Amino acid sequence: MIYAVIDTNVIVSALITKSPNSPVLQVIQRIFLGRVCTLVNDEILAEYKEILTRPKFGLEKETIDTVISELQNHSLNVDAPPSGVVLPDPKDVVFYNVVLTKRDDGAYLVTGNIKHFPACRFVVTPREFLDIVDAPQRTMFVNDFSR
C-alpha cells in the first residue's frame, strides 16, 4: 500500500479543475480506487472542511461531504507528535508532521506548493506522485541475484 498525506491545495484543485486528465484529479481518483491510503488527523480533516466550504470555490455541500467521507474511508488516522520544524506557512506543519511520522512506511506528502516544504524525496507534486503510484511492479526472480 502507498501512503500519502494530501495537501489541501491538491483536493481543492481536483474539485475545481475542468480537465479530466489533471494530475490532481487523478491523484484523488487513485485514492478513491483504493490504490493509495491517505494519512490524516483531526487537524487535517478540519482544514479540508474549512477550506472546501469557502464560498469562492463554489462547491456544493453534498460534494464536499462526499469527498471528505470518501477520503476518510481510504484513510489512516495518524497521531503525529510535533517535529519542531518551522515552515513558511504554519498551517502546513501538521501535514509535514504526519508524513514524518509514517516515513518508515514510505509515506509521501503530495502538494502543489513544493516550495512551502523542505526539499526532500518524499515531498512530491501530484504528477510525481502519479509516476510513483503507477510505476509497474517489478517481480524479482532468483536469477536477479546471480550477477
Language model segments and positions:
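PIN/NYN-family metal-dependent endoribonuclease catalytic core
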Residues: 5-6, 18, 23-53
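A secondary-structure boundary/capping signal
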Residues: 6-8, 40-41, 113, 125
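Alpha-helix capping/helix-boundary segments
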Residues: 10-11, 44, 115-116
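Acidic catalytic patch
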Residues: 42-45, 63-87
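Acidic, metal-coordinating catalytic cores used for nucleic-acid/nucleotide bond scission
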Residues: 85-91, 114-115
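Acidic, metal-associated active-site segment
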Residues: 89-108
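Acidic, PIN/NYN-like endoribonuclease modules and their adjacent C-terminal/linker elements
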Residues: 104-108, 112-147
